[in-house]
């Protein structure tokens, strides 16, 4: 997911852990 990158960079990184 990269849509969160535009909203929040850190959220994108955390999302990677949640998805993974």
UniProtKB/Swiss-Prot annotation:
<feature type="glycosylation site" description="N-linked (GlcNAc...) asparagine">
    <location>
        <position position="4"/>
    </location>
</feature>
<dbReference type="GO" id="GO:0004190">
    <property type="term" value="F:aspartic-type endopeptidase activity"/>
</dbReference>
<dbReference type="GO" id="GO:0006508">
    <property type="term" value="P:proteolysis"/>
</dbReference>
<keyword id="KW-0964">Secreted</keyword>
<keyword id="KW-0378">Hydrolase</keyword>
<keyword id="KW-0645">Protease</keyword>
<keyword id="KW-0064">Aspartyl protease</keyword>
<keyword id="KW-0325">Glycoprotein</keyword>
<comment type="similarity">
    <text>Belongs to the peptidase A1 family.</text>
</comment>
<dbReference type="GO" id="GO:0005576">
    <property type="term" value="C:extracellular region"/>
</dbReference>
<protein>
    <recommendedName>
        <fullName>Pregnancy-associated glycoprotein 71D</fullName>
        <ecNumber>3.4.23.-</ecNumber>
    </recommendedName>
</protein>
């Amino acid at each position: 997911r990269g849509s969160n990158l535009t909203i929040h960079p850190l959220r994108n990184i955390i999302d990677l852990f949640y998805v993974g």
